[in-house]
Amino acid sequence: MDQGRLQEAESIYRELIAAGTNNHIVYGNLAALCGMQGRYSELIKLLRRTLEIKPNYPEAHYNLGLALKEQGDLTAAITSYNKALQLRPNYPEAHNNLGNAYKDQGDLTAAIASYNSALQLNPNDPETHNNLGVVLKKQGDPTAAITSYHQALQLQPNYPEAHYNLGIAFKEKGDLTAATASYNKALQLKPNDADTYNNLGNALKEQGELTAAIDSFNKALQLKPNFPDAQWNSALTMLLGGDYKNGWEKYEWRTKGEKEHAKPHAIPKCKQRSGKLDLRQSDPLLLVTEQGLGDTLQFMRYAIALRDKGISISLCAQPKLHPLIKASGIDPSPLTPKQANQVTEGEWMPLLSVPGQLEISPSNPVFTNPYINTKEDLTKKWVDILGEKPHPVIGINWQGNPQAEKAGLRGRSLALEAFAPIANNTHISLLSLQKGFGSEQLDTCSFKERFVSCQDQINETWDFLETAAIIGNCDLVITSDTAVAHLAGGMGKTTWLLLHKVPDWRWGLEGDTTFWYPSMRLFRQKDQGNWHEVMERVAEALQKQFGSTAMPTEPTSPPQTSAKPQPIQDILAPISLGELIDKITILQIKTQHLQGAALVNVQAELNALETTLNNLQLNLDPTHIQRLKQVNQDLWQIEDDIRDQERRNNFDETFIRLARSVYQQNDQRAAIKKEINTTYGSVFVEEKSYQQY
């Protein structure tokens, strides 16, 4: 068998079994032969016979677990791995594969525990470090995942899967340069991997390198022609770059493959329209919405365009949009997805297939007139509620659905506090159009008094039809890339859209206007993530349009010079490794307690420091970081407790104990930092001096 003479070996083992042997090694080796040839059903049968002969055989239980997992029976596989570990607790391979089974089952906590058990027994196994990183990333901790991947790569530098996974984690953290480098390294080691080319293309696209991105997607498609993810990502990149002809064609891949990037909200029983739409057809056509509310608001206009061409059109849409659809004359009786599922007559088509059918492009917009309306009585209602407007009313909206941002719209939202330069203009009043996610920022906003007096009443209004009436009473809408942008744009309302540097495909990379909405003006980031510069431009544009009087500020000492102060640049100074990790853990704790602009600032600093640490590519002991973070968490709580005692004017023994615990915790903190510096050979070290008493 060792010489590869598999058939001969199998014949010998079967002859022994036919002769009546009851030897567990014979059955086990024959099972191994079957496994090498992918004959898992036979493998499982033979392993079970092996265990009947010798129940306390850990290797057989382990191999049975591998076979059961291969066949998709995760529960049975977990049982087999656990039996192997009962017989041999110090079995790192069993712990590792038990972690894999738990991961596939979705029990990430149990998976992490299993991987850690494996690493305690065999800390030099790169595969387990890589597997742990995958689960940590799934848990939403890309920083810890990056540490695990670096540990795997220190043990095995030419480990393509670890480089690939490292790229995924870097991309999730927004470090696109590092992600690109990791994907390229993975491709040097494994040049024929379509998934890596696809992910590299996405990282390049998000950096605005569209030609290189499309080249990467094409390489993925050369390796795997019917690769839905690469086709879909290529479509988005082409559309972003203005290649509408090829982009719309590839956009049809969105409903294919396991992921189904844009699943229709209903699957009617009638025939789905495929191929080019015949504009002379007599059969009714049902358009079925897909993706988000903003997509429906943007593309439902084409129901009107098709109806104008003589096609009998009906629309299935999200129920919360039905009153708006009716009032806008798009469909007097829109269907819910549940109703659309029962339609048997005519044909149906996903809504976002229509732009490709109509060959929509900047030179052929087909439909640019305002197409969204509200009810006149609702508009009058909000005229009365808002009352006499002493200043122009600016409707603002700052955040979209966080889940959508994770899926591919990263960076489109900004904090409410970023609107502070606008709020400083006393010639305007602000009106929040924010609903749901992000609306809690109103409670801690530094310019709360700048909102209209009826803001609380507006906050309670969730109906799109009524929101349209409120927008109708605004003089201008300023919004990030959310459904509100499409609602206001579809109404023909003057709208200023705030876009991050590489936005969603529909906005392109250049220009301050868009053919989708003639009433819209685009304000683009010049530097990725820099909303402050964008909002300064918006504030200047507001001043030109409505005039400005700055908000009064507290009197200050007169300046010593008339020269305009320059902003302080990032200060770069060497520090010890322990100090760097200490600062990172403090910022991680702050992210759990802060919100609004403060959270944005802390997250930016945290990302910068974590990137610095990751670039060192150290094989850090996670316990150092965990211990230091725990001490800083304890210090945070102690400070809260001390402030609480002081607020109550309580300076008893409890206060004294808490005060003493501060320096005790700081001594422990210094000791851990010194241990880190000593362990990793930091040039700078931790020193403390104590008052003798």
Where are these regions (language model features)?
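Alpha-helical solenoid repeat scaffolds of the TPR/TPR-like class and their adjacent stem/linker regions
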Residues: 1-563, 651
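Extended, charge-rich alpha-helical interface modules
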Residues: 564-693
